[in-house]
Amino acid sequence: MVLFGLLNLHLQYQKYGRQMILQERIEILNKLSAYMAGNEPEWAEAKERAARENPWFVPEFIEKAVNSITNSFLDPKLLTNWAAQYHVPDQQSQPKKVGLVMAGNIPLVGFHDFLSVFISGHIAVIKPSSKDEILIKHIVSELIKMDARVSSMVFFAPQLAGLDAYIATGSNNSSRYFDYYFGKFPNIIRRNRTSVAIIDGTETAAELDLLADDMQTYFGLGCRNVTQLFVPTNYDFIPLLTALKKYEYYLDFHKYKHNYDYHLALLIMGNKYYMNNDSLVFAENESPFSPVSQVHYQFYSAPEGLSHLTQNTDIQCIVGHGYIPFGTAQAPSLTDYADGTDTMAFLQTL
């Protein structure tokens, strides 16, 4: 059973004797992949409950997140190569307790952090987001059913203290809190980030269709969602707006429609120029961060003038020709680390 709190952490760790070796950890993750790809009644119920608890987690987004994890993260060959790249030992001689503060903007967004700690052989102490706790808790409970020793490697806690290291993901405001409490320990603290696309005007209809996915998957709430476009002067937006029409059904979701109506009204009352396709608004704005249902854009005259974007710490990834291919922003690999900070390398220093 999943433990809540840290009171029994040390005793629980000792209870099962021999640690899981690396190959056993990879094997159980392969079993987890099969479980997540299936439709066992308990798993189906957990996904349904997660969708009920958080209206932003519609079933199609939960399935997309699950498919991304099973296809890109849990393949045994990928895991073996990933661990070998960092010389992960079979067993940690002195496993460290690593606190994980997880975000909740999209389903299972904190899974990669959990996976990194688990495959490294350290002990994960997780504080899940209240917006996304059902899925991760169910996954861990299933792992424990597969092998009771997992219960000595993964814990849940309402508050994190007295640990060896911390990985915390949140907003710019919460990051100041994290800095204050976790700053004196080894840490990775992540702040607000978003993604942009550079359009050169030669994109095909198929590429624009894929860009629409990069923009609107998960309602645009992920840090890898494109929320700002850089387009050539005199760019014709009509083909892209047309490609985005496949997401008109988002207006059937009241939280999305509320955002759309509200932000459109602000632009109208402010007498601001905008474009829309009746479900998404384009507004010229220098900020890479845009609200749900709105995407910002800026014009450029020369591609060289955009070189600074690769150094912008607000930007998670750049989509476009010569950058991340269209349609792949929401399909990160094991080594696409959030904020560009190598989580596995960090864990190997503990």
Regions found by a protein language model. Name each.
Residues 85-105, 157-162, 172, 280-282, ...:
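Donor nucleotide-activated moiety binding/catalytic core segment of transferases
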Residues 80, 106, 173-175, 237:
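Glycine-rich nucleotide phosphate-binding loop and flanking beta-alpha elements
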Residues 2-99, 296-305, 314-325, 332-335:
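N-terminal Rossmann-like NAD(P)+-binding subdomain of aldehyde/semialdehyde dehydrogenases
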Residues 219-350:
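NAD(P)-dependent aldehyde/semialdehyde dehydrogenase
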Residues 6, 14, 146-235, 291, ...:
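Conserved NAD(P)+-binding/catalytic subdomain of aldehyde/semialdehyde dehydrogenases
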Residues 33-40, 70-73, 147, 182, ...:
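Structural signal for hydrophobic packing residues in well-ordered secondary-structure cores
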Residues 83-146:
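Conserved small-residue-rich beta-alpha loop and adjacent elements
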